[in-house]
Amino acid sequence: MSPLECSECFGDQLLHKTYTWHLTLHSRPNFTRKRDTRSESLEIPVNVILPQRGTEPFLRLHNLYSTPRCSRQAALPRMSRRVASQHSYPLNRFSSMPFDPMERPTSQADLELDYNPPRVQLSDEMFVFQDGRWVNESCRLQPPYFSPPSSFHHKLHHRRLAKEYQLQEENKSLRDENRALRDENKALRKENKILQVFWEEHKVTLGHEESQTSSLLHKDTTSQEVVKRDNTTLPAQRSKESTLQLIREENRALQQLLEQRQAYWAQAEENAASTEEGKSTSSPKEESHNSGLLPDQSTNHSSPFEDPKVPPTTQEDSKTLRALREMVNNLSGASGEEDGKVGPNLPDSAQPLQLLREMNQALQALQEENRLLQEENRALHILREEHRVFQEENKALWENNKLKLQQRLVIDTVTEVTARMEMLIEELYAFMPAKNNKDPKKPSRV
């Protein structure tokens, strides 16, 4: 049973399209001998089978006709050794291979047809067309060796159908799994969207709570910071106020001391002048009589600072001195405390002297600073004068440059005008007629 009539594999009677072409091989004449100019031809049918179900096309060369098709073919003699063609490469290279390497072509002997393979004699050898290629007749294989059994084609096709069926089943199962996975993916996306909405709502509520707690914490922290600042600024403000108050009291005390000293020194000078006048007028007798009273007077007038007429001034001086020393001790550190300890041990007569010395030192320092400031002020005045002088010089130079530029412009315009006038005069004299062949005198330049 041939594959063209197989109903078990394909289910139809006509499942292949068969196309047949006839190849005609013409042999050239052999010109080695002058008399032999004959040419012979050989006709070979080519059968091409195109299957319709899943198989691939392949080419077969067969001699489908046991008898010659026409009288001309029957009349053709066999190719002899003498007229054989020298060129055998078309026959040696011409082969028939199936397009599918898994399928072996079915020979015409397997199809149980009458089969006479074509033969060609080239040179001394005979070639037979067997299984799609030209084979030497001496090396020709027997049909049981090279031809597959008749059931090979059916088994191969059944295997292919089984593989295709398995692949289709696998594709169906994979499609079902893909659909199930898509459905699960859709459900998970919906759940994800719902969870995102819930999370945003929860986030908003958490943000409100955090803002409330943060506002409360911020208020608490601000109140604590304000309290801390107050606590830190209060002693600083108190210390500043105390120092300012001490400085004010010190200034007032210094002013009072200066006023008292001025009045005291003026009164002392008057007393000294009156005593000198009294001494000059008094006689030596009176001095001898009053010698007993001199020690008392000397004791009473031992220091110029002890004036019996002005007892409250000394008390005020001592009070102010003590206040000043206390302020100095408060402002200065341990050195001031040591001075305060030593100060009260001094006698009352030395306290105003020490105060005057300190005031004198302060005044000298202030005078030195004032002198330095005056020198700086003088230097600044000198610099201002120099700057003013430089400005005046720059202004004068700028005016001078401006005048020079104007002068240059005027000179350039005058030269240009004179040049044009000369050109015009020359043109006028050129147009004027000559008189007695005398050259006209050119006018002088303006």
UniProtKB/Swiss-Prot annotation:
Residues 161-197, 236-264, 353-411 form a coiled coil. The keyword Coiled coil applies. It holds the Pfam family Chibby. Keywords: Coiled coil, Phosphoprotein. Homodimer. Binds to NEK1. Belongs to the chibby family. SPERT subfamily. This is Protein chibby homolog 2. The lineage of its organism: Eukaryota, Metazoa, Chordata, Craniata, Vertebrata.
